[in-house]
């Protein structure tokens, strides 16, 4: 059982973060935000996939002006992602957004940041304080020589202290870099010194395959340590894939459960069916079903039922047939050409 770090509770548009609340899954649109219909269409798809908070890029005034309509019609809370421009931040704050992401390292004006925080407090808007390895303050870079974990943590702690000194406490912090060990170290240092909620992620993780592995390693370690109140898996891929991978990581640690979990054996010389193809077909048929069960698809009967005893239902495939089992107990033998249909039928009949 993972003992999660105790953090203060905040909310973003009604979504509770920190405290005793579950880890929240976030993503970010890849549309031009001023293309309102396209952006909303993607937000709705992401919400259907399980995304609970969405961030949108706001690089221009045109994007900031589009936020009002997007916020009004979005099914989930919207965070405006602001870099460099306090002016755009103020425009965004007038739109009704639920949260704003600020990177003090590239705004670089304490007076303007103070004004933004005062406006956020007045409007009850949550802030995500983002510290990134690519935009550390020059003084910290000179002190450490490079964006080490200690450097990132110090920047985040300094800015957190600044936020609290101006009377603003409704914020969470993200400390991100593309280096996994650097990320872990920075978040660990920060987590040991504050009760501020942490948004975790490996930035610029890469394409879907490599990026998923990198994110699973980095986020998995942090989550196992109890660190992380919200999470985003950053991939060079469809944002819906980010949400899917995020839930898979959380599910593997027992922190969240969404959809059907499929477990299958790695195959060996004993198998007598095309197991990868069977698994692919089952996965395809079950995609989108939000039933909290575990399905096992095993390639032979040698250890299948014993190894997959924790599965709710499964197949142990053999020569031209398979044993269908539930909770580790054989139910019936089915023919190879009927085994997938029989499995799906039994899943539909399960009482959850």
UniProtKB/Swiss-Prot annotation:
Pathway: Isoprenoid biosynthesis; isopentenyl diphosphate biosynthesis via DXP pathway; isopentenyl diphosphate from 1-deoxy-D-xylulose 5-phosphate: step 5/6. One of its GO terms (biological process) is isopentenyl diphosphate biosynthetic process, methylerythritol 4-phosphate pathway. GO terms for molecular function: 4 iron, 4 sulfur cluster binding; 4-hydroxy-3-methylbut-2-en-1-yl diphosphate synthase activity (ferredoxin); 4-hydroxy-3-methylbut-2-enyl-diphosphate synthase activity (flavodoxin); iron ion binding. Pfam families: GcpE (PF04551). It comes from the Bacteria. Its EC number is 1.17.7.3. Its cofactor is [4Fe-4S] cluster. [4Fe-4S] cluster binds at residues 265, 268, 300, 307. It catalyses: (2E)-4-hydroxy-3-methylbut-2-enyl diphosphate + oxidized [flavodoxin] + H2O + 2 H(+) = 2-C-methyl-D-erythritol 2,4-cyclic diphosphate + reduced [flavodoxin]. Binds 1 [4Fe-4S] cluster. Keywords: 4Fe-4S, Iron, Iron-sulfur, Isoprene biosynthesis, Metal-binding, Oxidoreductase. PANTHER family: 4-HYDROXY-3-METHYLBUT-2-EN-1-YL DIPHOSPHATE SYNTHASE (PTHR30454), 4-HYDROXY-3-METHYLBUT-2-EN-1-YL DIPHOSPHATE SYNTHASE (FERREDOXIN), CHLOROPLASTIC (PTHR30454:SF0). Belongs to the IspG family. HAMAP family: IspG. This is 4-hydroxy-3-methylbut-2-en-1-yl diphosphate synthase (flavodoxin). The gene is ispG.
């Amino acid at each position: 059982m993972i003992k999660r770090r105790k953090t203060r509770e905040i909310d973003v548009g009604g979504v509770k973060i920190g405290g005793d609340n579950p880890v929240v899954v976030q993503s970010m649109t890849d549309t031009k935000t001023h293309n309102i219909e396209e952006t909303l269409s993607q937000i709705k798809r992401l919400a259907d996939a399980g995304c609970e908070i969405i961030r949108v890029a706001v690089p221009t005034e045109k994007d900031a002006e589009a936020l009002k309509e997007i916020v009004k019609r979005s099914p989930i809370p919207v965070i405006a992602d602001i870099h460099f421009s306090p002016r755009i931040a103020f425009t965004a704050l007038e739109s009704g957004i639920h949260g704003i992401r600020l990177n003090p390292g590239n705004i670089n004006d304490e007076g303007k940041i103070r004004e933004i925080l005062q406006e956020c407090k007045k409007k009850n808007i949550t802030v995500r304080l983002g510290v990134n390895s690519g935009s550390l303050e020059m003084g910290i870079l000179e002190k450490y020589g490079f964006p080490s974990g200690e450097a990132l943590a110090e920047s985040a702690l300094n800015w957190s202290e600044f936020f609290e000194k101006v009377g603003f406490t409704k914020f969470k912090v993200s400390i991100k870099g593309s280096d996994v060990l650097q990320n872990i170290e920075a978040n660990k240092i920060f987590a040991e010194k504050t009760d501020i909620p942490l948004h975790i992620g490996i930035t610029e993780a890469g394409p879907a395959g490599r990026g998923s592995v990198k994110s699973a390693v980095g986020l998995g370690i942090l989550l196992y340590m109890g660190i992380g109140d919200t999470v985003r898996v950053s991939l060079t891929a469809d944002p819906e894939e980010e949400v899917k991978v995020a839930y898979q990581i959380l599910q593997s640690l027992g922190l969240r459960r969404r959809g059907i979990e499929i477990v299958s054996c790695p195959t060996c010389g004993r198998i007598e069916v095309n197991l990868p193809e069977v698994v692919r077909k089952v996965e395809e048929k079950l995609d989108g079903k939000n039933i909290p069960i575990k399905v096992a698809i095993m390639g032979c009967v040698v250890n299948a039922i014993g190894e997959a005893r924790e599965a709710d239902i499964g197949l142990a495939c053999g020569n031209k047939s398979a044993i269908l089992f539930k909770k580790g107990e054989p139910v019936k033998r089915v023919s190879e050409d009927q085994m997938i249909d029989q499995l799906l039928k039994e899943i539909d009949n399960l009482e959850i």
